[in-house]
Amino acid sequence: MEDSVFTKIIKGEIPCYKIYEDDKTLAFLDIAPEVMGHTLVVPKNQVDKIYELPDEDYVAVMATVKKLAQQMEKVLGKRPIMKVIGVDVPHAHVHVMPFSPEWKDGVTLEPSEAEMKAMQEKLAF
């Protein structure tokens, strides 16, 4: 299987705005966010569909999603929402985003590097 863009990020071949990492998962800001703080949680084990993950990796992804959601609510003061879509990148992942009334599903922002770094500093744990 060819490395996905997420595997290349995990390997350090492509830079990212890292929020959290452990031995099984990586969480980083989406570079085309729907809202500021839009974060992706990916397993380090590359599989196409989230339901193809071994149970241990699936549980690790969901544990990271939970930690990230708690951090997001604490730091940003907004209730997070999660989406599992599974069609845009052939590597299982979960979108975690702070909910905002002005959010429009599918509309992306173009934040500056300074805005991305500032959000990374707020959310990183």
Q: Each predicted region: which residue ranges?
A:
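HIT superfamily nucleotide-processing domains
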Residues: 1-125
